[in-house]
Amino acid sequence: MATATVLSRLSLIPNLSSKPKSFSNKRTTVSVRAQASFSDPFVLQLAESLEDSLSPSSLPLQRIRDSSAESLLSTPWPSRRDEPFRFTDTSFIRYSQIEPVSTQQLNSEILDNLTETHFPNAVIIDGFVSNLTIGPSDLPDGVYFGSFSGLPDDLTNRVSEFIGDFDSGDLFWSINGMGAPDLTVIYVPAGCKVDNSIHLRYFSGQTGDRESKRLPVSNPRVFVLVEEGGEVGIVEEFVGRDEHGFYWTNPVLEVVVLKNAKVKHSYLQKESTAAAHIKWTFVRQEAESEYELVEVSTGGRLGRHNVHVQQLGPDTLTELTTFHMCVNEQTLDLHSRIVLDHPRGSSRQLHKCIVAHSSGQAVFDGNVRVNKYAQQTDAGQLTRSLLLKPRATVNIKPNLQIIADDVKCSHGAAISDLEEDQLFYFQARGIDLETARRALISSFGSEVIEKFPNREIRDQARNHVKSLL
């Protein structure tokens, strides 16, 4: 039979002060740092290979590499004994021969077969921007979209104020910080509304093979800064080069949304069924800002999305709407954390998943923290799961931590197979059982897919999900 685990916690806890962060501009090499106190030889070897694979970089990117090296060297490889990875097995990455991708390789096969898009777009292959398409009227004046190295001096100084100023993530976040070969920047000036969404398409140009266990890893990194009153839509699309490509994509997206600004973030993950995809999304929201994420993920032997959103001002809105679908022997994992620190903040989260394979697993760990001064907060979280095969597994852990006392907060979880009365309703109208099941499964995910703001992305996601049924 299918397996489901729900671990729910609603807690009222005392206020905790955060530990101050310290930064050093001094270059610290991996080998010297490791001699002091390091206990995981595998991570040390990986860190050294990342360092050796990169060429010298600009000062802001070098700061990211230095701080990431420090955190990486104090972090062992995660195991199932670690609570954040309790249900997520990363051992197939650990026991592969990991090879950082060190050079940009223009892949004509990928570029020649790109579908048309009406958006300003960039193709990112192995972390390098390989094809940037922006027409003269695609972006308003003052908007920048491209490599950090191409920023004008005034924007370089402005963007550098925020780079590296995010709370640390886990080991995979640090690996990206050390291994990112470039930084793609999206900058929107104050009061500017970008009508056309900016489309980032990620590919892995190099693939290994499962027999030799050679696993190329790429570390794409994107930074978004939206000034006061600005608005932009961002589409991230991760595409597998072939159905059985063996590689590891380890991306990071950092988003700063200043006062009264809006960001609509669409994320479509269709990696190879043999690949690893571990992504971090960090978001900082100032007062009266809005951040909306819509996600559909179906790819990867292991696919994990870590989302961390920090509300840093009052009257702030956060909305996360996500859909994961397992149709192979795979694990799809969403770890989210929303921190509300100011009055009248609002957050809405809906996560849906389908497990349609007997060796498939879905994981949801959703954390919402309402701190002391976040009075009159309105926070809601709901997760719904469909288990369609015997031994299919879902592990769900909603976690709502409330310190404020004047709030409206709720969370819920539902796990089931298709309802017999719904199937009967279709059959009573002459629709066969298989068609009825497909219709119900498709409609389950449509609630999320229809939230994509762009019709092109909605159609693409809808057709992709239908092809997997």
Task: Pin down the residues of each PLM region.
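Compositionally biased, low-structure terminal segments
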Residues: 24, 86-88, 445
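Short alpha-helical "patches" and their helix-cap loops
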Residues: 22, 105-110, 203, 461
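N-terminal amphipathic, basic helical "cap/leader" segment at the start of enzyme domains
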Residues: 2-5, 30-169, 173-174
